[in-house]
Amino acid sequence: MRLQEIQLVNFRKHKELVFAPSEAITVVYGPNGSGKTNILEAVHYCTLARGLNRSLDRECLNFDAGYFLLQGTFADDRGIELSVKVSYEKNVEKKIFINSDELKKYSQLIGRIPCVTFSPMELSLVNGSPQERRRFMDNALSQTNKSYLDDLLQYRRVLQQRNTLLGAVNEKGMDRDSLEVWTEKLTQLACSIVSERLAFIERLFVYIEPVYEQLGLGEVPGISYRSAAGRHANEIAPEELFSFMMQRFREIEHQEIFRKQSLAGPHRDDLVFRFNDTDVKKYASQGQLRTFLIAVKLALHTLVSDTTGERPLFLLDDLFSELDGTRIEKILEQLEGAGQSIITATDRKDGSGVRSVSIEDLL
């Protein structure tokens, strides 16, 4: 998949801007605060229906503008074109169109244009809260597995309903039979989600190892899944997972009623990243964290490509910061032949297959 052209109107710093990257590696360079990242964010909107760093739609308006408009033209690896339009008007929900047809749900865009990102904000994936790592798994799986996205959206609805019911049992003494029904529904969806996540982590690890080796990193990487249902949940056969989780919910039912929330399930699970058998977020330096995250994203890019048969767009914000020249060259080597990569940087970068564009030339 590649971006042929994108137009920004009243988006962030840009009243109007047109950007047409090369089919390989494009580096958009310029000083901090000049609007480079805004271009990546606009592309991200057209692929995943939201901003790069989870900004609110209204925060993306250009100064006093009442609306913004993004129009992107993409082509898959077979050359078939796809147009995406995202329009937002202040105090009105944004609208998304694919080939002029308005989407009924934003989720219909997910997976149509595979996209992998790297951003300094995403360091929280490694050293932040479990929510960041769950979001990482959900985003990756939702782009490659439509049934996972459907299960995830349904799980969130059932979870909300069950939490409401837990509160009603606590406050009004409602009968628990209804709670059992919703627990079964939640558990069925939870088992599907956890099984897919475990399979995803296993596949991702296979891709991380060679990336580490090719980047010349000395550590031995590792990744594991931590279930809120108990430390042995990962080891249970898929056909036995439902019974295990139902039993777990029965054991903690009194706590859940007291706290009015579901205390087990994939919405409370976590990932643990390691190298040399130590937790990355506890012992890694800032430079090691950054390099580890880049390796994970390079591995994810290859995984998505192999899974979908379509090379995803690669959006990399401030990629070269805090990296030495040797490491930068190795990363660029990894990106060669990987499809289209759009990188932002403060300085021009030249190399094989690299086209550098000054942000000033786009304004």
Curated annotation (Swiss-Prot):
Q: Name one GO cellular component term.
A: cytoplasm
Where is the major localization of this protein?
cytoplasm
Location in or out of the cell: Cytoplasm
The record ties this protein, via InterPro entries, to: DNA-binding_RecF, DNA-binding_RecF_CS, P-loop_NTPase, RecF/RecN/SMC_N, RecF_2
Residues that bind ATP, according to the entry? 30-37
> Which molecular function GO terms apply here?
ATP binding; single-stranded DNA binding
Q: Does the keyword Ribosomal protein apply?
A: no
Annotated keywords: ATP-binding, Cytoplasm, DNA damage, DNA repair, DNA replication, DNA-binding, Nucleotide-binding, SOS response
Question: Looking at the keywords, is Membrane present?
Answer: no
Choose any GO biological process term that the UniProt entry carries and state it.
DNA synthesis involved in DNA repair
Q: Which NCBIfam families match?
A: recf
The role this protein plays is: The RecF protein is involved in DNA metabolism; it is required for DNA replication and normal SOS inducibility. RecF binds preferentially to single-stranded, linear DNA. It also seems to bind ATP.
Q: What protein family does this chain belong to?
A: Belongs to the RecF family.
**Name under which the protein is recorded:** DNA replication and repair protein RecF
Q: Name the species this protein comes from.
A: Chlorobium phaeobacteroides (strain BS1)
